[in-house]
Each structure stands twice: as structure tokens, then as C-alpha cells.
Amino acid sequence: MAITTAGDICALYPLCPILLHCSTLMHLSPLRNTPHVLHAAAAVTEYAFVLSTLVFPSFCFSLPSPFPFPEGEGGAFYVRLFLNALSEEVLFRAYIPERLCHHATSCTARACGEVLSVLLFALAHRPAGSATLFAGAAGAALRVLFVREKKRSGSRARASALCTAVHALWNAYAIAAAAR
């Protein structure tokens, strides 16, 4: 399967958190006899994926409007919409804040990690223009929802699923409203 269009590249964007998670496992849980070069490669890969979140959304926002859908394309669009929401939730609500705050001992350090993850989420939405501020506020609200649900249920997966559903529904509503 060849990648031929901008849409194909954007469809690959949701794979970033999966690859990020795999490289992080290698980086955080090094095997005893693994060469240091592999650990360095895992760390570079991890940070490259995090930084790519600031590039790929810009590229995806520049795609032409999907409306009206070509025949049979509506379902694929909404699947992509869901997968993009899932990848952003895993990355910006679970991975980045918890990675930044993992060794933080002070409230100030934890707050800086939380604020940085919200800023990165807003920056990833900068092609939306003035809606970037709204995206930052929504990112903060989704992080609060994530933390509360994780505390209530004890499950990071359940918290991610809830935030993904809210995020995907909002994106679907916003895109449909903009198309009118």
C-alpha cells in the first residue's frame, strides 16, 4: 500500500501514540544487556513522535473540507475523526502529563507539566486560528475530566475512552456545523 495523498498521511497519524508507547517501554525498561545506542534511539524516537504532534495536525488541518462526502466516504471520515481524537487523548491527556510529572516531587513541577501538556495541545491546533485558545481551554477541561475519571475508576484506559468519546463527538459537531 503506497501513501499517495495527504489524507493517507493523516490516516497514519493515530499510529504515533502506539509507536511512542513501544519506544517508551524500551526506553523506560531497559534490558540488562541492551546497547546504549538502542536506548538513545528509543529516547530520540520518543521525543520525535511528541514533536511530530506539532507538525501533523497542521498538515491535516490544511486538507480540503470533506463535505459533501464522495459516495461511501462518510464512514471512513468519521473513523479517522475518532482515531485522531484517540491519538490526541492518549498523547496529550495520558502520556505527556504523566511522563512530565512522573518524577516531579513538588506541586510547582507537577503544575508545570500539566500546563506544558495543555500548551502543546493548543499548539497542535494552531492552524485553527483563533480557535487555538478554545482548543487550549478544551484541552485543560479534558485533562481535568481524565484525572477525575482515572481517580474514580482507577483505570487509565477508561479515562482515555471517556475523553476520546467527548473529543470525537465535539470534533464531529464542529465539523458538521462549519460545513453548513
UniProtKB/Swiss-Prot annotation:
It is a multi-pass membrane protein. Pfam families: Rce1-like (PF02517). One of its GO terms (molecular function) is endopeptidase activity. GO terms for biological process: CAAX-box protein maturation. InterPro entries: Rce1/LyrA-like_dom. One of its GO terms (cellular component) is plasma membrane. Keywords: Cell membrane, Membrane, Transmembrane, Transmembrane helix. This is Uncharacterized protein TP_0335. It comes from Treponema pallidum (strain Nichols).
